[in-house]
Amino acid sequence: VDISFFPEDPFALDKLAKENNVTAIMDCGVAPGMGNIIFSYHDQSMQISDYECLVGGLPKNREWPFEYKAVFSPIDVIEEYTRPARFVHNSQLVVKEALSETELIDFDGVGTLESWNSDGLRTLIDTMNHVPNMIEKTLRYPGCVEYLKVLRACGYFSKEEVNVNGKKIKPIDLTSKLL
């Protein structure tokens, strides 16, 4: 069972797993993962035309400046802020910039949260291609997106090495360590 994101196509492992009599379960965290399982369960008993997964790891106690605690690899969290978001609209694959189409959503007992398009559908794009509208949105406390856009624009999420006092570092490595 794999719960981490990796950029390669997870279906590429299918043949290798079958050849070695191995059951491989990829992308089995909260989302993708548990959300996919719940979606599939309901898909077996009803016709689904719209699937919207709202997901976010929010700390119980909000602490400035991020009001967020990474519950998995910090680099993978940062990837959510830089990797283009893929979703399905009217049976067509749509790709948007990370952190796009921000909206505020009110939740009883929680309050207002900020959401944006994220790239968590992963295998659902292929395995549930009969569902014409599917999207995943990440949730954070309000104000997070603008803060992240500033960090991204300043290069803190860059994978390109920079020279700092004679040492080459990738800004994303430093940022993930500090977060």
Residue ranges of model-derived segments:
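C-terminal catalytic/substrate-binding lobe primarily of soluble NAD(P)-dependent oxidoreductases
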Residues: 45-179
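Short amphipathic alpha-helical segments and helix-helix/interface helices
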Residues: 13-14, 39, 43, 125
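Short alpha-helices
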Residues: 28-38, 43
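Rossmann-fold NAD(P)-binding glycine/threonine-rich loop
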Residues: 3-26
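Gly/Ser/Thr-rich loops at beta-strand to alpha-helix junctions
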Residues: 7, 30-34, 59
